[in-house]
């Protein structure tokens, strides 16, 4: 297994970096199941009658447990994007009925907003994996990929780390970043994190700034 001390933040921009982590089994971010806060959010969407044809993106999805759960609930337009091929192949084996065309081995930052527009983008350990110098690019790309009434929803680490991924942060940093591009509907301590992450996660819901009186779920 690769020694974490040998990893540099400059490597995270390369597909080979992430492929090697999967090849070596160095996937400490993978909890082996749907993240409970995101499962609860998906169930909230179902309870509120959100269309199962909603366009949903999960970037940097890895083994994509959330995408699998959405698929099981009948959502038909879920897209998974990851740098690495292996987790996408594994996902396809676990969910043979999932549309192969929706499994994208690609650079999130290279997705064309003219081709892809989403109602929901779900953040789960992608933001903390990118080079911190690209966080503004992340926010800009999210803004471009979301429909006017779209939502960016997910989890952020409320904790600082060393120079290797995961790259953490805190609520104030995230507010400063995201309020430039979005209306912050929710950014609060997560009450239903898995035990190892309790007290170190923030749950958030962001919407496009120009939309007034939009739904907040």
Q: Where are each of the predicted segments found?
A:
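Conserved acidic residues
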Residues: 119
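Short catalytic micro-motifs in class I SAM-dependent methyltransferases
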Residues: 125, 129
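Class I (Rossmann-like) S-adenosyl-L-methionine-dependent methyltransferase catalytic domain
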Residues: 1-58, 62-116, 130-217
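A conserved beta-strand element that flanks and buttresses the S-adenosyl-L-methionine
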Residues: 122
């Amino acid at each position: 297994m690769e020694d974490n001390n040998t990893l540099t933040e400059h490597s995270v921009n390369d597909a080979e970096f992430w492929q090697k982590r999967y090849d070596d089994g160095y996937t400490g971010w993978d909890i082996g199941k749907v993240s409970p806060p995101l499962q609860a959010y998906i169930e909230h969407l179902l309870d509120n009658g959100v269309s199962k044809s909603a366009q949903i993106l999960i970037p940097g999805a890895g083994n994509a447990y959330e995408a699998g759960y959405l698929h099981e609930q009948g959502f038909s337009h879920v897209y998974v994007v990851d740098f690495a091929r292996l987790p996408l192949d594994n996902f396809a084996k676990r969910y043979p009925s999932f549309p192969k065309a929706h499994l994208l081995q690609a650079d999130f930052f290279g997705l064309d907003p003219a081709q892809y527009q989403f109602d929901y983008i779900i953040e789960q350990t992608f933001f903390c994996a990118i080079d911190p110098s690209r966080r503004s690019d992340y926010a800009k790309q999210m803004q471009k990929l979301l429909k006017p009434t779209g939502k960016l929803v997910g989890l952020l680490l409320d904790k600082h780390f060393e120079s290797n991924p995961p790259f953490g942060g805190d609520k104030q940093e995230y507010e400063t970043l995201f309020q430039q591009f979005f209306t912050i509907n929710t950014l609060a301590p997560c009450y239903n994190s898995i035990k190892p992450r309790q007290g170190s996660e923030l749950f958030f819901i962001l919407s496009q700034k120009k939309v007034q009186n939009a739904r907040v779920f």
